């Protein structure tokens, strides 16, 4: 993990996400791909959400979980999450008590409804 990533790890630092978004008139682009903030053992690049493009229910971000790392159990209460797995594989444990499990591989697309408890293990 780079020094920058260590500095961002789980800081909860508030970042102005608008500065990474270009666009107007209904089409928006995020062009910054470096990690800019950390939360729950996940490193995030700029993404698209209500905070910067006005999406009411959907959040999509570039996120990195270090090899062998875990994003501890959590719930997204007010928004949906869409994930495209670029490389590697992860195990999602989800549902009440996180008792269900599914393995995702590079190339998989994942959709998580609001209110679903889930924990992610980078395998």
Where do the model's predicted regions map?
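A short, N-terminal "cap"/entry segment at the start of jelly-roll beta-barrel domains
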Residues: 1-57, 72-73
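Short proline/glycine- and basic residue-enriched helix-capping loop/turn segments at helix->loop/beta transitions
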Residues: 64
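A short beta-strand-loop-beta hairpin characteristic of the jelly-roll/cupin
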Residues: 70, 79-106, 116
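Asparagine-centered strand-capping/turn motif at beta-strand->loop junctions
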Residues: 121-123
């Amino acid at each position: 993990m780079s020094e920058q990533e260590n500095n961002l790890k789980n800081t909860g630092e508030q970042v102005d996400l608008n500065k990474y978004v270009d666009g107007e008139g209904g089409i928006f682009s995020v062009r910054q791909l470096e990690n800019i903030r950390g939360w729950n053992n996940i490193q995030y690049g700029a993404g698209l959400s209500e905070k910067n493009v006005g999406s009411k229910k959907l959040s999509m971000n570039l996120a990195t979980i270090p090899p062998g790392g875990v994003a501890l159990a959590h719930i997204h209460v007010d928004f949906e999450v869409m994930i495209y797995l670029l490389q590697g594989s992860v195990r999602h444990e989800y549902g009440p008590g996180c008792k269900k499990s599914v393995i995702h591989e590079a190339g998989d697309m994942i959709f998580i409804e609001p209110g679903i408890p889930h924990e992610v293990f980078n395998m």
